[in-house]
Amino acid sequence: MTLSDNPKVVIATPLGDIKMEIYADKAPVTSENFLRYVDDGLYDGTFFFRTVTMENQPDSPVKIEVIQGGMVPKDRAYPSTYPPIEHETTEMTGLRHVDGAISMARMKPGSATSSFFICIGDQPELDYGGKRNPDRQGFAAFGQVVEGMGVVREIQMRPHDDQRLEPPIDILRVSRTG
């Protein structure tokens, strides 16, 4: 795949659009999982529900800055998530958690489903070997914001209670483009 062959996705929010390139060529398992949620409309009507700033993680020795979204609402009639996917580390893909990187949230390796986050600033502690997760496997980066980082930063600065956005920011629609 060339750069132009990679899928493009737009997240529509009331604050504006976030346009992303999905690196299906470098992170095929993670990209396919994310695009399955997109294509099936499962992100439509969900939320950005978490913001992590330097100020709201006082007990964390390793600080990061991200916004997190993609939880499928519990009132959906169909299953909320597909099975968890294999963990594609940044060591495997060559991708890094740089400003605007999109990555899958997880607890343990192989537990990622629908929840994703977008990095604000470079976040090397989220890469393979980084110290944010004790297992040091990092998180599975799979794309990059190409337009709309102003919207991402605006979401990050919205009112929050601890790390929970209050109110959460609506994800109106997530769809492929061009």
Language-model-derived ranges and their functions:
Residues 1-178:
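Cyclophilin-like peptidyl-prolyl cis-trans isomerases
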